[in-house]
Amino acid sequence: MIVTRARRLGDASGQSVDIVLRDGLIEAIVPAGSAFTEGHEVVDVDDRVVMPGLWDEHVHFSLWAQHRRQVNLHHADSAAQAARIMADAVEANASSENPDPVVIGAGYRDGLWKDAKTTQVLDALTGDTPVVLISVDVHSCWANTAALDRFGVVGHRDDGVITEREWFALSQQLSDVDATTIDGWVLDAAHHAASRGVVGIVDLEMTLSAPDWIRRVASYGARYPLTVECGVYPEDLETAIAQGLRSGLELAPGVTVGPFKIITDGSLNTRTAQCVEPYLGVEGEHYGALNWPTEDIEAMLVAADKAGFWLAVHAIGDKANQTVLDIFEKNDLHGRIEHAQLVRAEDFERFARLGVAASVQPDHAIDDRDVTDVYWADRAERAFALRSLVEHGAQVVLGSDAPVSPLDPWITIASAVTRTREGRAPWHLEQGLTISEALSFSTRSTLEVGQPADLIALDADPLWLVDALGSDLAKASDALRELPVALTVAAGAITHRHNV
């Protein structure tokens, strides 16, 4: 394949080039019109800006595919409103041709709600239909009595709120959809991701998803739209080791085993992220907590590393981040900390010194700005501190944590650079990234000979957009979030094209 009349992102000369792709690699880059085209598919991008394809370094892909079909609770500003939204959904479901046995809503953010979540509130409006509402951070749910009964949940009869490891177990039952259905939803989500310039994902689905991806690629019959690294969780570590799995092992074309993932603490919205200092605005001294004893976390990380797995460790609170960094340092481990939302001032330099990457989700800062200003108001300058990580030399990679935030790298990039959306004033702009940094942290390759044939063509130049609109960050944020992608090529195969 030859991508002709391409303007490389950041090329000051502005000269168009032909990019020759062969066997999944960039074979040559020559002046536009000079490539030998006979026998090649030629794609004319008409002087559009071309850059490397984008990666989302942290997704839960099946959950995201399902989330796209669930009741949207993002705008619910109270428990009562969320219950009313679900009541409407129950009514619509009952009148449908094939009603779902469980009605699921997703995306509520209750950190600042004034009223309490109770089964009584939900039961009064949803009746005998099992209803489950999933929080925006996917660390808890709120269920009515019918749902508690259906899934055999013990306790929680007053509030219907289930959190952390108990919720993670329940979520697997909710995600138990037949293979044909879920594979169709996943493929739809993959095509949509490709339309936003995504060429690869790190899939941290909370089950052993390797067999699922092998099946999907085999049934697709062509190069799947995404390159996938699929993770492994503690519950499946022994099985994965027994099966000979290790990070980097190819399972199918474009599918490899990804990292070992462990969730060490909770989240900010549920006030379960483990902190050095107590949460503000919470009765008593509440610090959050680890999901596992420290010695168990250490033992699992050492065992996974010994078995050949890369390490990806969820840590949100500053105490959890300190603990994980201590474990890495003590055992000479390397890997990534996922989220790193709150970090002690003295721990920023440890990321670079210990060779620990920060896998961060910039849109969470925009989602959680108001909650942060309540519960972490006395430490907000250390929250979602991307600039501090970069200035201390940390390797930073960007992702969405979909379904927590949408799987769209342009939303991620916009949040990283502008620290705002919906016209609000930027939040702690001093912790933002430059547009060049955000783009670099969203890619794994460059437009050079010998690099992977992963590239995208854009209908606008993101560097120019930010330069032109930089004085109005709200407009710059909107422009980046909506930036059109004309062409996506992953491993030398076209996975999306529009008007080219």
Q: Positions of the model-derived regions?
A:
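P-loop/Walker A phosphate-binding loop and immediately adjacent motor/lid segment at beta-alpha junctions
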Residues: 469-500
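Short amphipathic alpha-helices and their capping/turn segments at secondary-structure boundaries
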Residues: 46, 146-156, 238-259, 343-355
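Short aromatic-centered micro-motifs
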Residues: 20, 262, 488
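Structural motif
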Residues: 22, 45, 448, 490-491
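Non-cysteine beta-strand/loop elements that form the S-adenosyl-L-methionine
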Residues: 60, 254-272, 356-365
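Conserved, mostly hydrophobic/aromatic
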Residues: 47, 144, 197, 257, ...
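Divalent metal-binding segments
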Residues: 2-5, 12-243, 269-303, 307-320, ...
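His/Asp/Glu-enriched, well-ordered alpha-helical/loop segment
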Residues: 184, 301-312, 316-335, 339-340, ...
